[in-house]
Amino acid sequence: MSLLTEVETPIRNEWGCRCNGSSDPLAIAANIIGILHLILWILDRLFFKCIYRRFKYGLKGGPSTEGVPKSMREEYRKEQQSAVDADDGHFVSIELE
């Protein structure tokens, strides 16, 4: 049996909990960790699109163009754009006669 869970035990005619009024540091720490975990999980579910979009796109600065001639920067930008445009072409329209 785990020390971190509350166990209901029959006490006379009522059901009670052994952890009520406990000053056990392990039980207190487990309760705090459980509450923090619940709060973080709720925030994650509420804002997961914002959070993961920020990590996926916001933190990527791309390669540095410092010291690269402007003509090469333009060529690189065009290559990147054509790669994005080519990726959009994976949808194929099929016409049946």
Swiss-Prot record:
* Any one of the GO CC terms: plasma membrane
Q: Under the GO molecular function aspect, what terms does this record hold?
A: monoatomic ion channel activity; proton transmembrane transporter activity
Provide the transmembrane region boundaries. Answer: 23-43
Which domain of life does the protein's organism represent? Viruses
Question: Coiled coil: which residue ranges?
Answer: none
Task: Please list the residue ranges that the record marks as compositionally biased, kind Basic and acidic residues.
Answer: 71-80
Q: Where is the lipid attached (S-palmitoyl cysteine)?
A: 50
The UniProt entry, under Pfam families, shows: Flu_M2
Residue ranges in the Virion surface topological domain are 1-22
**Residue ranges that the UniProt entry lists as topological domain Intravirion:** 44-97
Record entry for activity regulation? The M2 protein from most influenza A strains is inhibited by amantadine and rimantadine, resulting in viral uncoating incapacity. Emergence of amantadine-resistant variants is usually rapid.
Q: Name one GO biological process term.
A: symbiont genome entry into host cell via pore formation in plasma membrane
Query: What would changing residue 39 to T do, according to UniProt?
Result: In strain: A/Puerto Rico/8/34/Mount Sinai/Wi, A/Puerto Rico/8/34/Mount Sinai/Wi-M2-P10L and A/Puerto Rico/8/34/Mount Sinai/Wi-M2-P10H
Q: Quick one: where's region Disordered?
A: 59-88
Could you give the domain comment from the record? Cytoplasmic tail plays an important role in virion assembly and morphogenesis.
Family membership noted in the UniProt record: Belongs to the influenza viruses matrix protein M2 family.
Q: How does it assemble?
A: Homotetramer; composed of two disulfide-linked dimers held together by non-covalent interactions. May interact with matrix protein 1.
Q: What does this protein do?
A: Forms a proton-selective ion channel that is necessary for the efficient release of the viral genome during virus entry. After attaching to the cell surface, the virion enters the cell by endocytosis. Acidification of the endosome triggers M2 ion channel activity.
Task: Identify this protein by name.
Answer: Matrix protein 2
- Please name the source species: Influenza A virus (strain A/Puerto Rico/8/1934 H1N1)
Which gene specifies this protein's sequence?
M
